Amino acid sequence: ATFRVLAKVLAELGKVSRKIAVGVDNESGGSWTALNAYFRSGTTDVILPDLVPNQKALLYRGGKDTGPVATGVVGVLAYAMSDGNTLAILFSVPYDYNLYSNWWNVKVYSGKRRADQGMSEDLSYGNPYGGDNGWHARKLAYGLKERGFMKSSAQSILEIHATKA
């Protein structure tokens, strides 16, 4: 995924005040199959892409609930990897920037595991990155590493590259 493609995905969300476009490049050597998307707050109007082959990208978007509600968008995407483990991606774009800021995280879980509130909390409190307009990288489990970038704005972009370690 490139910033240009993600900017187009973001624009398709229209005038939603808290929104995000997520792009995850699969450079893992295997394929990924969608398990689910879990939203702690916010929603989406698109279906989670079912299959992400190696050398392709997952593109997704989310936004705050419509109407006069004081929420942002916080979600987790879960993908079963062809090695039998689960790739999870957390994104958070808060409603109130006086109290919170954007953040994100990536983790590989052992076995097949759907995204839920427990996974959301694990990723939220498991040393997430700030959405600080900077690149961050770390080794993940099971032979993977990630490198990613998230904008600090209320209309955010999250770009992640998952590669062999």
Swiss-Prot record:
Residues 92-107 are annotated as: Trp-rich region, which is important for the binding to lipid membrane. Gene3D superfamilies: Cytolysin/lectin. Disulfide bonds: none annotated. The record marks Y100 as: Important in the initial contact with the lipid membrane. It is found in: Secreted; Nematocyst; Target cell membrane. SUPFAM superfamilies: Cytolysin/lectin. Residues 1-17 are annotated as: N-terminal region. GO terms for biological process: cytolysis in another organism; monoatomic cation transport; pore complex assembly. Octamer or nonamer in membranes. Monomer in the soluble state. Composed of a long N-terminal alpha-helix and a core region rich in beta-sheet structures. Before the pore formation, the alpha-helix binds the lipid membrane, partitions into the lipid-water interface and stabilizes the monomeric molecule on the membrane. Finally, it traverses the bilayer, thus forming the transmembrane pore. This is DELTA-actitoxin-Oor1a. It comes from Oulactis orientalis.
